Amino acid sequence: MVAQAPHDDHQDDEKLAAARQKEIEDWLPITSSRNAKWWYSAFHNVTAMVGAGVLGLPYAMSQLGWGPGIAVLVLSWVITLYTLWQMVEMHEMVPGKRFDRYHELGQHAFGEKLGLYIVVPQQLIVEIGVCIVYMVTGGKSLKKFHELVCDDCKPIKLTYFIMIFASVHFVLSHLPNFNSISGVSLAAAVMSLSYSTIAWASSASKGVQEDVQYGYKAKTTAGTVFNFFSGLGDVAFAYAGHNVVLEIQATIPSTPEKPSKGPMWRGVIVAYIVVALCYFPVALVGYYIFGNGVEDNILMSLKKPAWLIATANIFVVIHVIGSYQIYAMPVFDMMETLLVKKLNFRPTTTLRFFVRNFYVAATMFVGMTFPFFGGLLAFFGGFAFAPTTYFLPCVIWLAIYKPKKYSLSWWANWVCIVFGLFLMVLSPIGGLRTIVIQAKGYKFYS
């Protein structure tokens, strides 16, 4: 019996380690709740994908022109739907295991360390970048609402509106996981469809403007080319929900007989139909009505009736509240995983309270300091949006499944990779030029 003791101790240690691991997984935001319905994934995906950037699509069309504009809109929709399908398929490709996080899939494809180095920095650039942009967008939309509703009120700085917007997140960020924010996400998804409908329906009711022109606005060839690159980025990065798709799928229950990919794919299809209903009418109707004179936010071109534009701005605020939460959740998960697994903090509500408040405060501070952050993201985001959305899923697919050379799957993946690389190189050039031109007007804490 004495000889058996070390073996028993070893088994006990393993059991303790497994129990601790399960306790941590049951606490972390991505894996703590796995009882989501398929329609949860639909509105989470709509909220993640339809950004306030949809209101800038007519302006992007004016930089691209009819032919290239429609081509990029449709190509981006098709390619990103294909890469999203790949990620949904790969979530449970290893029997008995789920890749609940983007970097776990990367680690399976490229190795433990390399997978982390490839995926995590890009995912963080997108998620933290989007959260900061939404801080500014929420603040700007609140400011616009205030100006429209109370036109003789004393002007209030954008900084204060960003603080007001952030105050909501100091409360909502303490909802523990994706399923607990499903109500917020549903409201956000409905709002995105609502303000998109207001944008294109109001434009259509105005009728085509007199002296409307559809040619390129820039006077020089260089200006036209740079604007084209910028418009390319604006359209392509309107589809950026891939950064949170595995994390959303992780909330859906799964068994060998009924894997999660069925309900998840149903949700994705519904989400993509809603995305098409938001993007295509806004982009095409907005450009058709206003031509190349359209503002970079179509609501600015509409101006009247003031009550309707004010309503649309409040809808934008509600939508970006939901979007912020969707993009913040994987970051909360990474921070909490690091503290609990690597630094051995105990998984407690107090820890979560400090971590999440710190994150909201940090994104609020950056948004207040750099209210022109959206211009910066067009540049930096190009290096992260294109890979995570357009070609990283294809590279992972090729690495794992190794389809036969020159087969349909092989060609489809390589077309997506080339298109994604093309975006990654060209769109930041347009973004950089925008920064250079607008830098004179950049003011900190405006």
Swiss-Prot record:
GO biological process: one example: defense response
Q: Which key words are in the record?
A: Amino-acid transport, Cell membrane, Membrane, Symport, Transmembrane, Transmembrane helix, Transport
- Report the GO terms under cellular component: plasma membrane; plastid
Q: Which phenotype arises from disrupting this gene?
A: Lower biomass at the time of harvest, but no visible phenotype until bolting. Decreased uptake of L-histidine, L-glutamine, glutamic acid, L-serine, glycine, L-asparagine, aspartic acid, L-proline and L- or D-alanine.
What are the inducing conditions?
By amino acids.
UniProt cross-references to InterPro entries, sorted A to Z? AA_transpt_TM (IPR013057)
Summarizing the function annotation, the protein's role is: Amino acid-proton symporter. Transporter with a broad specificity for histidine, lysine, glutamic acid, alanine, serine, proline and glycine. Involved in both apoplastic transport of amino acids in leaves and their uptake by roots.
Q: Identify this protein by name.
A: Lysine histidine transporter 1
In its UniProt entry, the species of origin is given as Arabidopsis thaliana (Mouse-ear cress)
